[in-house]
């Protein structure tokens, strides 16, 4: 997912070694590092915003990753052991790149990140150059993986073959949302309020409109705003109301969404609201009356109220450790680590291999026809050489102040 300027991209903290270990640092920078350097462990790095406006996303991915790392290392007969280090990028692209360089100096061999889009796009340029395997839990822009055509059919960013996503791409969120609204007959007249200054929001909107047209789903009005005009949504809501919209699609983040819900309540306007992954987090937004989010729907790959054993165990561990209910970002991050672990086992890579060799073998493994993964955010997950994940989204609705599965 992208945050404002396209969430989803992790950044890594820079650790500068003392002069006595410069030679070892140079080996790591070249993709080296021996088994003795790593103590038999693969070095996994994580980057995200752990402070600042997007911290809710970064901390969720950090927590989910940590739980997975702890589980892997606790396996008595496990052949894979992991060393894990996080870095705060404050949702800033430049800081994210600096974080990556620092983690690289630490000896990072695989990157699980970054969390938000703009920083992730910046970091992928570095990992692609270094041929380091990168799996992001939540950076959803197609610019993260590259090789995707834009709305005009032009490919402006070449495919970065080392980068993969656990989350849905922005276009896929738009397509899936239109299909879900149509199939479930959630609304007959749809209004869209989107952020015209945000690639994340625009990308979802374009695909939503295209799919809605194919399905015969009526979009009666499209109301844009920008980051500079995101404090009052009276105009947009009045336009939706005048157009007779009985459902408003919100391909935006939870901060502006909270203002839209508050203003709609003031106006006495009560359409259904349907969001995307950026909406996840609205229930923990400080100062927001969560009763206003009652009935809000969104698509997500994860439901904390699911009854399968894996989800119940994860939710229980997360609540005990972090005193909070995990969201999809935490679940996606957990799955990232477990996918990496499974790919390491299947590929036969070892911690003493060079970064580039590890990357090539993991790419070949994760894209092979016989590689599938069952996790918190889906079963039978696969990855193609485009870097995109194939898995089914779940419909969620906010009920009594909690996310509840609509498909249970």
Where on the chain are the PLM-derived regions?
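Extracytosolic ligand-binding ectodomains
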Residues: 2-15, 31-408
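Bacterial N-terminal signal peptides
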Residues: 19-24
């Amino acid at each position: 997912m992208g945050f404002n300027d396209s969430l989803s991209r992790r950044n890594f903290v820079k650790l500068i070694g003392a002069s006595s270990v410069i030679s070892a640092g140079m080996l790591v920078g070249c993709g080296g590092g021996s088994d003795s350097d790593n103590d038999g462990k693969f070095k996994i790095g994580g980057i995200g915003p752990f402070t600042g406006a997007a911290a809710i996303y970064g901390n969720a991915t950090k927590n989910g990753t940590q739980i997975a790392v702890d589980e892997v290392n606790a396996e008595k007969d496990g052949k894979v052991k992991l060393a894990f280090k996080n870095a705060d990028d404050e949702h800033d692209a430049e800081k994210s790149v600096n974080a990556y360089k620092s983690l690289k100096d630490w000896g990072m061999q695989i990157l699980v990140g970054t969390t938000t889009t703009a920083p992730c796009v910046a970091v992928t340029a570095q990992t692609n150059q270094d041929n380091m395997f990168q799996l992001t839990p939540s950076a959803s822009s197609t610019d993260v993986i590259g090789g995707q055509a834009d709305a005009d059919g032009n490919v402006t960013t070449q495919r970065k073959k080392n980068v993969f996503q656990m989350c849905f791409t922005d276009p896929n969120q738009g397509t899936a949302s239109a299909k879900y609204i149509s199939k479930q007959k959630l609304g007959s007249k749809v209004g869209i309020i989107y952020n015209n200054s945000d690639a994340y929001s625009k990308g979802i909107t374009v695909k939503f409109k295209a799919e809605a047209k194919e399905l015969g789903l009526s979009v009666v009005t499209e109301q844009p705003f920008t980051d500079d005009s995101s404090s009052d949504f009276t105009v947009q809501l009045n336009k939706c109301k005048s157009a007779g919209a009985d459902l408003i699609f919100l391909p935006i983040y939870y901060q502006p969404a909270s203002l839209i819900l508050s203003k709609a309540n003031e106006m006495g306007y009560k359409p259904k609201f349907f969001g995307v992954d950026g909406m996840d987090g609205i229930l923990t937004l400080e100062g927001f009356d969560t009763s206003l989010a009652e009935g809000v729907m969104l698509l997500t790959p994860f439901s904390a109220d699911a009854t399968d054993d894996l989800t119940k165990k994860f939710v229980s561990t997360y609540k005990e450790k972090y005193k909070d209910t995990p969201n999809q970002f935490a679940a996606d991050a957990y799955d990232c680590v477990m996918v990496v672990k499974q790919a390491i086992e299947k590929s036969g890579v070892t911690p003493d291999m060079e970064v580039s060799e590890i990357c090539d073998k993991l790419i070949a493994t994760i894209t092979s026809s016989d590689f599938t993964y069952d996790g918190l955010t889906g079963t039978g997950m696969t990855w193609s050489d485009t870097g995109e994940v194939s898995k089914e989204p779940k419909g969620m609705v906010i009920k009594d102040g909690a996310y509840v599965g609509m498909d249970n």
